[in-house]
Each structure stands twice: as C-alpha cells, then as structure tokens.
Amino acid sequence: MKYATNLIQTRCAQAKKLKPIKLQEMIIENSELTDVSKIFDLYRIATDYMKLKNQVYWPEFPKELIINEIEDNRQWKLLIDGKIACIWATTMNDELIWGNKSEPSLYIHRIATNPEFRGQNLVEKLINWANEFGKSKNLKYIRMDTVGLNKGLIGHYEKIGFEFLGAKRLEKTDGLPEHYKNGEVCYFQKSII
C-alpha cells in the first residue's frame, strides 16, 4: 500500500510540473470596415493557393462588394487570440446560383483561412456557428457552392456533414463573379439541426 501511495504522490508531483496550456480564445463576429485590407489579403492568399493547385480561382472582388457586405452585417470573421483566422460572407437568398429554392437557408460564400491557422478545422467551427445562427433565424439549411470539381474540397465538405448535391454549369452568370463562368458549380447542403 505504501508503494501505491508513493506512486500516486510521485505522479501528482509530476503533474504539478507540467507547463501551463494556453487555450486559444475564439470569437466569431461581423467584420468591420477596418478589416477590408486584411480581407483582401486573405482573398489574395486563397487565390494564389487555388492557382498553385490548378483549380478554378477567384477573381479580384470589387471593394464595394465587401464594403456592402460589411455594412449589411453579412461579412464575418473568426478571431483567434485577436487575429483574423478565417473570413466568409453570408446571405439568405442566392437565386443567381441556386435558382428558385424556396426553403429558408443560410448561404455561405468565399471562405478564406489565414495560413497561420490552417489545419485547425476552422471550417467545421464556422459550420457549427452557422448551424446555431440558422436555428436562431428558423432556417432549414446551410448551403455552399464551389466552382470546379475539387475532389478534396468535396470530400472535406461531406466529412463535416454536407450532402454533395451534384454539379452543373450555370446558364446565366450575369451579376456573378467571373469564376462562375469558368467551370461547373458544385452544390452542398446540410440540414440545420
């Protein structure tokens, strides 16, 4: 019994010597006008990555688009320890891409992750946030799309609970960013639970 007590005391003493673990503080909030340059930096990084992977890549988005999204509270950021780790935009209607879908849904666009925070499952965290946001608005689905048949991205979205609904080339692209003219659009949907 004395051995067991000494062993427990030794293990407790060792546990006390562990270095403190710093937990990251994570916050999701609306982007602000002061974030515009950082948003465009992240878009450029994401576009360069898409080019490197020979994927359909984003054009340079008009600054007015981002400013309007910020002013409409539809541009979001995930902060980790005060640094922008991920950005995205939302809308409640996406008829140009999704057609005449009548179910109330949250549409997510242009997810861009700060390379310093890659590999931390941030998309999954933002989808968890989207689920709670959608519930608070009585929405039925979270919907996303991507241009080009990116099998890795399709698999990733399926892994985090999205149903891949298929792909098709859009017939009408007026009013959409240029990359929608360059490939098939892949559609993803997840029920809000």
Question: What role is predicted for each listed range?
Answer:
Residues 114-128, 137, 148-154, 159:
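Conserved glycine-rich acetyl-CoA-binding loop
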